[in-house]
């Protein structure tokens, strides 16, 4: 295995991908790429511009003239820039969460962002998380992980995340939103949410995130010794 392999982490909303990917990138000294944040940035722009989320040609035109960049600040936290503006906090709003799957299902939007994502990973040493990293974006990634958890557990985690940002959402409502998002993500024509054939599937409903990270680090270490 390459000493600086690319690691693909996929899974549904709330499965813990971002937390695992962030910790893993720090542990290994790799670049962390949150592809979901990139789609959220495009969704935010669509909302701001008043683009109908059912208007796929309109969303395609929007994506074509949109710049999304990811940078790490002095504390090692990922910052998301939309056309030069830091939108790291705003893209996590409930409105964007509802819109992002509708934006991400547009083929031209995915093509635009996948191009950017592949360029970021061209040198290796990347931890990239999203919905179709191991199947579409980086099908040749040396390590592929698919994280999953029950809808109830994912809803609980998402509610806690939103509460920390000042948003209060009912648990039942959140479960319904998670379930609907799963439906959209798994049935879309472009890059549907499915595990890669060679991915390791990890159910982290009750598994501490530290244990998940330790398992993946062990895989990287074992590969380097081969």
UniProtKB/Swiss-Prot annotation:
Question: What InterPro entries has UniProt attached to this entry?
Answer: Cytidylate_kin (IPR003136), Cytidylate_kinase_dom (IPR011994), P-loop_NTPase (IPR027417)
Give the location in the cell: Cytoplasm
Q: Name one Pfam family in it.
A: Cytidylate_kin
For this UniProt entry, the molecular function terms from Gene Ontology, in alphabetical order, are: ATP binding; CMP kinase activity; dCMP kinase activity
- Tell me which GO cellular component terms the UniProt record holds: cytosol
List the disulfide bonds in this chain. none
- UniProt-recorded name of the protein: Cytidylate kinase
